[in-house]
UniProtKB/Swiss-Prot annotation:
Highest taxon, organism lineage: Bacteria
UniProt lineage: Bacteria, Bacillati, Bacillota, Bacilli, Bacillales
InterPro entries: CinA, CinA-like_C, CinA_C, CinA_KH, Competence-induced_CinA, MoaB/Mog-like_dom_sf, MoaB/Mog_dom
Gene: cinA
Name of the featured protein: Putative competence-damage inducible protein
Family of this protein: Belongs to the CinA family.
Organism encoding this protein: Bacillus mycoides (strain KBAB4) (Bacillus weihenstephanensis)
């Protein structure tokens, strides 16, 4: 069975809010074997919504609507679908009582337009809204399945999980979709694709989908099977083939990002970290502190943007700054070594470079040096030549910092 998600709301078209509902629903539907082939966004306009419905009916078995179930005049999803299907709208007594009770509790007038929220398509299965007012509904008619859900994610998501997914499972073949994401760093998308292109071309179950994002590449392996263990075997077989070829660049699965991996290794090994940031201006430290309980391993950091701060606080020799410059291997080494000493940490890491858009110290944008020192070992400096916008260079430098930290910690 295939589905189309139709998000209703002019605010979506204007870019005032992001359509996070479509992402959530697509992922959930895929997990129960329903393929989403189209996402449509339409404003609060009866005629345009009607055209969107007619088009979706031509190409999808299931139409899933989000938004337009509220009390105002521009909330017209139910009315438009009722007109298109020639179905009557009737009051759902449970929803009507729930909405009425809410207004009584809050001492507000229960107006006719709020009463409208309890209207549902005649003959539909009603999905209770445990976090709002307007109920959702599902209707199987004329060979199509119509699902109507509220727009606010805080209402739609719990409604889907509690009521909608069990309803939808009646329409699936029992063949579910299982996915695993393999994460790679230090290899470009085109380089990785060349190494596994024959696997991508030859696989139908599981499929292999590459995606590049800010210096790293992911491969999503997706298998269909009615049995989870069999799907796991299908995915594992293809994963093994991939890692035989590009395993040196592999670092993790799914949402286990580099900064999570690096901090977890710090905790496991009982080591502490300090950072000195010039180029990245606190981005590295910010990502470090996204990890819960990181105070046990993160001593702190110094944002040393100007040269006098590098010299006075982190004791980079004036001669180094004068002859080699702040953007240099020598400066990166001193920053890493001295922030480690200053904050009494086991590990020091530093970032210096040119974010752009203009050159600095006769060095081009994207010139980056990352210093890393662990305990009493000699400092190591990694040189990078990155491309992209100012923000992309800073973010990618941060990611490279976590990558090199992670790889060094693996060796200990």
């Amino acid at each position: 069975m295939n589905a189309e998600i139709i998000a209703v709301g002019t605010e979506l078209l204007l870019g005032q809010i992001a359509n996070t509902n479509a992402q959530f629903l697509s992922e959930k539907l895929a997990s129960i074997g329903i393929n989403v082939y189209y996402h449509t966004v339409v404003g609060d306009n009866n005629k345009r919504l009607q055209k969107a419905i007619e088009l979706a009916e031509e190409r999808a078995d299931m139409l899933i609507f989000t938004g337009g179930l509220g009390p105002t005049k521009d909330d017209l999803t139910k009315e438009t679908i009722a007109s298109t299907l020639d179905e009557e709208l009737v009051y759902d007594e449970k929803a009507l009582t729930s909405i009425s009770d809410y207004f009584k509790r809050t001492g507000r007038e229960f107006t006719e337009n709020n009463k409208k929220q309890a209207l549902v398509l005649n003959g539909s299965t009603v999905f209770a809204n445990d976090h709002g007012m307007a109920p959702g509904m599902g209707l199987n008619t004329n060979g199509k399945v119509y699902i109507l859900l509220p727009g606010p994610p805080k209402e739609m998501k719990p409604m889907y999980i509690s009521y909608v997914e069990p309803f939808l499972c009646k329409f699936t073949t029992g063949e579910n979709i299982y996915s695993r994401v393999l994460r790679f760093f230090g290899i470009g998308e085109s380089q990785l694709e060349v190494k596994v292109q024959d696997l991508i071309d030859g696989q139908t179950n599981p499929t292999i989908a590459p995606l590049a994002n800010d210096g790293e590449v992911t491969l999503r392996l997706t298998a269909k099977h009615h049995d989870a263990d069999e799907a796991e075997k299908l995915i594992q077989h293809v994963e093994d083939l991939i890692l035989e070829r590009v395993g040196e660049f592999f670092y993790g699965y799914d949402q286990d990002f580099l900064h999570y991996k690096a901090i977890r290794l710090l905790k496991e090994k009982g080591l502490t970290l300090a950072c000195a940031e010039s180029l990245t201006g606190g981005l590295f430290g910010n990502q470090v502190t996204e990890n819960a309980g990181v105070s046990s391993v993160f001593k702190g950091g110094v944002i040393c943007y100007q040269n006098d701060v590098k010299q006075q606080i982190l004791h980079v020799p004036e001669e180094v700054l004068r002859t080699d410059g702040a953007v240099s291997k020598q400066c990166a080494r001193y920053l890493a070594e001295n922030v480690k000493k200053l904050l009494k940490a086991d590990i020091g890491i530093s970032f210096t470079g040119v974010a752009g858009p203009d050159a600095s110290e006769h060095k081009e944008p994207g010139t980056v040096f990352i210093g890393l020192v662990i305990k009493d070992e000699p400092a190591v400096v990694f040189s990078l030549n990155l491309s992209g916008s100012r923000q992309q260079i800073r973010e990618r430098s941060t990611k490279y910092g976590f990558y090199h930290l992670f790889k060094k910690l693996e060796e200990i």
